[in-house]
Amino acid sequence: MKFLILLTEGIGLRNFSMTRFLSLLCGEGEVVIWHALPEQIGHVHDHPFADRLRWQSMPEHHEGQLPFLFRRAKLIAQLYWQNEAGTETVLKRTTLRGKGVYKLRNRLAEALGRACGRSHNQILWLDDMHARAVRQSRYFVDFLKFLNLERPDVVFCTHQRSPLAVPAMLAARQLGIPTATFIYSWDNLPKGRMAVHADYFLVWSQHMKDEMRNYYPDVAEERIFVT
């Protein structure tokens, strides 16, 4: 079996590559770590299964204006749709600052999020628009090419809130490769921090599974696993 692991930031590196996780996977087959980290990171640890483990840098890419707009609007819409106590506080804490075009972009995302926060169907529309914007980016074809060449049995994202993982997950799903992601923290669900979508979701507890079903009713119960 061939596993492809997405590592886009230090949190995933700490939680997975510095634990027994990689050893367990290497015992089952080949592992490719597709990362957006400094190149020397892959050589830090002398892994006992080095012959089954390969580090590969992702294509250089940055989140464009449209992908950011729809991702940010989706987060805000999710908070308004939940309409829970503390929503305004969370919004204030996540308010982005900027000047010129960035200030305009942030305000537009907030306005769009407020307008689409009335129903879950509108949030799904934002999610679809976000995916379309990423697929139309100039770097998306590079992700398709790499995954088509590697053809892993599963793509696992170590952190569901990372925008850098979005093109890889979308490319995998477009090619029919099963995908899974880990919900990093219990408070990521009520905060609307879901940049990537996957075929399967891994959570910490039954309570998190129940919250996942509540906040994301489009995700069937059999797609959520308690680890």
Q: What do these predicted ranges mean?
A:
Residues 6-19, 85-90, 157:
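A short, glycine/small-residue-rich beta-strand->loop->alpha-helix junction that serves as a flexible
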